[in-house]
Amino acid sequence: MNDRVNIRRALISVSDKAGLVELGRALAAAGVEILSTGGSARALREAGIAVVEVADYTGVPEMLDGRVKTLVPKIHGGLLGRRDLPEHLAQMQRHDIPPIDLLAVNLYPFEETVAKGSDFETCVENIDIGGPALIRAAAKNHDSVAVLTSPAQYDDLIAALAAGGTTLEQRRRLAAAAYARTAAYDAAISAWFAQQTGEMFPAHLALAGARQQMLRYGENPHQSAAFYRTGNRPGVATARQLQGKELSYNNINDTDAAFECVAEFDRPAVVIVKHANPCGVALGADLAEAWDRALDCDPVSAFGGIIAVNRPLDVAAAEKMASIFSEVIIAPDAAPDAVELLARKKNLRLLLTGGLPDPAEPGLAWRSVAGGFLAQTRDAGRIGRDDLKVVTQRAPTNAEFADLLFAFRVAKHVKSNAIIYAKAGATTGIGAGQMSRVDSSRIAAQKGGEKIPGSVVASDAFFPFADGLVAAIEAGATAVIQPGGSIRDNEVIEAADAAGIAMVFTGMRHFRH
C-alpha cells in the first residue's frame, strides 16, 4: 500500500529560524506553495524564495498586535479536513479551503523568556496561542498532514520530498513529537503560573523535560534510559563535557548527588561520591588540601567514584585527583593547565557547569510510585548556629560547633539512616543507608577507625534509643548533633551527660531515601 502524501502546500511560521532557508529552498525546488507569516516570510523572501503571506491567502489581516494571525477557518480547515471523506472535501471546496499538506511551526520561546527572569507581562506575551492550535490540528490529521516542530526534523522531511512524499509512519512519528512538544509547552506555562500564584501543588501537575541524551542503558544493563533536562539549575544537565566517555545513567545520578552536596559549603570543598552517597567530604584552604582530607575518609570506596568541587579546578588539585581512578570530575570551571593535565586520562569525564546550584533555592522533587508519583519541595533546609539548642550539661566548644554544623550539612546528602563523624571540617566516618541507626553508627565508626576519637557525630534523624549514641560515645565522639523529637530524648540526653559529651538539637530532620 502506497501511503505517501505528496506535499503541494506548506505553512511555515517559526520563531527559531535555524534551517528555515534550507527547508524553504527544498520545498520551492519541489514546486510546493509556501504560506508564511511575519518574520518567517521575510527571511524566506530575503533568501529569494517565493512565499504567500497568510493574510493575503486568507483575506484576513493580522490583528491585535499579531495575537491573531492563523486562527481562521481557511488555515485550520486546510489542516483538519480529511482527504478520505467526500463530505469534508465538498465543504472545503465550497468554502474555498485548499488542503495544507505540511506545517512547520515552532513556538514562542516561553521557557527561555522565563529562564531569563523576564517580568510577568513579557512572559505572558510569549505564550503562544496560534502555534499550539496549528500543531494540534495538523497532528490530529496526520493521515494527510506532516507537522514539523523542530529544525532537527527538517533533514528527514527534505529527504521525503525527494522520495515522493511523507509516509504514514513518518507522519505518525512527527505527530507524536508534536503532541509531546505542546504538552511540554503547556506544562511549562502551568508550572510558571502555579509559581506566580504561590500554588505549589495544583490539582493537575504536569512534568515536562527536553530529552538531552539517550543513554546506553539504565541503572542496570537490561534497563533502557534517557536523560531529560527540565531547567537551568547548574549541574550535570547544564554542564559542558570536555572529555571522556559518554555519561551513563549512574554517572549522572551520582554526579548530581556530589555537586548538590559540595554546593552546601562556602569554603573550598571536595566531595567524593559512590552510589549516590558521599564517601568523603572535606573543607580546606584550597582544593588540593580539601581533596587530601576528603580522600582520607575512605580511600577504598573513593576508587571509581565521582569528584565534585565548589571552586574552579586548579592544576595542583587536578594533579592529585589524577592519581586515582575516577569516573567523573564536576566543577564550576577549570584552569587551562588543569584541563590539559586531565586530558591524559582519556576515560575520565570532566564536566564544567559555569556555576553552583543554590542550596536554598525552592523547587520540587519527584519520585515515581506504582500508579503515580510523589511531589515534594526540595530539601532546602539549612541550620545555623543560632538554630541549635544545647540540651546537655556541657555545651560544645566553638570548634565543635563548627564541625557539628559541617557534619549535619553532610548528613543531609547521605542516605538514611545516616551517621556522620567529622573533625576539623572533614568527614572521618560515614554510615549510610542502614535500616537501624545503631548499625549506621557502628559502621561509620568501623570505617573511620583511629580517625574517629575526637570527632563530632551527626545523625540525620533523632536517636530512637540511646544505643546509637552509646555506639558513638564508645567510638570516641565528643559532641553530637541531631534533630531531637524522640519520646526517649531524655534517655538519650542522660546517656550523653553520663559520658560528658555535648549534644545539640536542630529541630530539623534530613531523611533521604
UniProtKB/Swiss-Prot annotation:
Key word Cell inner membrane present: no
Family indicated by similarity: Belongs to the PurH family.
Gene Ontology terms describing biological process: 'de novo' IMP biosynthetic process
Domain notes per entry: The IMP cyclohydrolase activity resides in the N-terminal region.
Stored CDD domains: IMPCH
UniProt name for this protein: Bifunctional purine biosynthesis protein PurH
Residues covered by the MGS-like domain: 1-149
SUPFAM superfamilies: Cytidine deaminase-like, Methylglyoxal synthase-like
GO cellular component: cytosol
Pathway: Purine metabolism; IMP biosynthesis via de novo pathway; 5-formamido-1-(5-phospho-D-ribosyl)imidazole-4-carboxamide from 5-amino-1-(5-phospho-D-ribosyl)imidazole-4-carboxamide (10-formyl THF route): step 1/1; Purine metabolism; IMP biosynthesis via de novo pathway; IMP from 5-formamido-1-(5-phospho-D-ribosyl)imidazole-4-carboxamide: step 1/1
Catalyzed reactions: (6R)-10-formyltetrahydrofolate + 5-amino-1-(5-phospho-beta-D-ribosyl)imidazole-4-carboxamide = 5-formamido-1-(5-phospho-D-ribosyl)imidazole-4-carboxamide + (6S)-5,6,7,8-tetrahydrofolate; IMP + H2O = 5-formamido-1-(5-phospho-D-ribosyl)imidazole-4-carboxamide
Gene Ontology molecular function, alphabetical: IMP cyclohydrolase activity; phosphoribosylaminoimidazolecarboxamide formyltransferase activity
Keywords: Hydrolase, Multifunctional enzyme, Purine biosynthesis, Transferase
Keyword Transferase applies: yes
Name of the gene encoding the protein in the UniProt record: purH
EC number(s) given by UniProt: 2.1.2.3, 3.5.4.10
Classification lineage: Bacteria, Pseudomonadati, Pseudomonadota, Alphaproteobacteria, Acetobacterales
NCBIfam families associated with the record: PRK00881.1, purH
